[in-house]
Amino acid sequence: MPDHLHHSTPALTSRAYEGVGDLSKMLDLLMEARSQTNDWHCAHVGELLWNYLVLSSHLPEREHIRLWHDRDGKLAGYALLREGPSVDWEVLPRYEGAGIEEGALAWVEGRLAELRARDPEKWKKKLGTGARADDAQRIAFLDEHGFHPGKYAEVNMIRSLEGPIPAATVPAGYVLRAVEAKDVHSRAEAERVVWFPCSDGDISDENYARLMTLPGYVRELDLAAVTPDGIVASNLNAWPDPVNRIGDFGPVGTRAEHRRKGLQRALLLEGMRRLKEHGMERVCVSTGVENLAAQALYLSVGFQIVNRWQEWVQGE
């Protein structure tokens, strides 16, 4: 048994999410957990921030985020019930197997019963979650609690930022720069155009403006290729984990009429350069196993496939 699982059962309490101060502690939890495990044991802070934005843009946060604290008041774990429905939970390594996972699932099932009674059409689908291929403990937990592998999967990719990074070649007619306040409408619109009707694409201008105020957001790492008339043609959000010196890319997108021009390649290279300036030593990105075009692009700029995330669905 790993050292971090040798513990007496702690006194854990749970409560609803109360505000951005809790979000900051959730980010701290992810960075601490990664420092004690590996690059794939838990979500990256960038994944949490984007998932939080989408959740809080559509759902009441207090009803869809649950926190667990130890006897000293330290955040030990959290769970998010998102649209889909899907659940994400993260637990500090020393508290894995201490009951938070069961508590999170029980909380989600209780909330889903309430939501389905209130709006059966919106919440009718089976509960989903996910696990990485090398996370035997989570896979065993899901199997024991009635989940089975679903249809969707992603490849997880990583690239070292050591050594020189090729210069970004920006196609004629575009400017590559950080997103500014004046770009909020076009940046949010780009998200809607590329990803809607997925919930990730249902982002208003006001929602995106709020993202820019959250802890963990770094404006210099929110990149876009912009046309002369101010249209965000392509975008890339880069996120730093300053504790573990690993960056993350996502979301990554380009409007259809601006594709096949090299914009995403330029943004990826510039994102790497800026992450390196912010002290990152490596960067990760994920994409669907069937999205061969995205995989080819990431491989072409030095990423390697090192892991796989698999959807798991509850019930038969």
Describe the function of each predicted region:
Residues 1-7, 79-172, 311-314:
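Acyl-donor-binding surface of acyltransferase catalytic domains
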Residues 1-51, 168-202, 231:
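Short amphipathic alpha-helix that is part of the acyltransferase structural core
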Residues 15-23, 31-118, 131, 228, ...:
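Conserved donor-binding loop and adjoining core beta-sheet/short helix segment
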Residues 77, 151-153, 233-234, 307:
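A structural microfeature
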Residues 97-114, 254, 260-277, 282, ...:
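Conserved acetyl-CoA-binding loop-helix of GNAT-fold acetyltransferases
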Residues 127-129, 249, 283-287:
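Conserved hydrophobic beta-strand within the GNAT/NAT acetyltransferase core sheet
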Residues 138, 142, 298, 303:
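Conserved active-site tyrosine of GNAT-family acetyltransferases
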Residues 163-247:
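Flexible, substrate/cofactor-facing loop regions flanked by secondary structure
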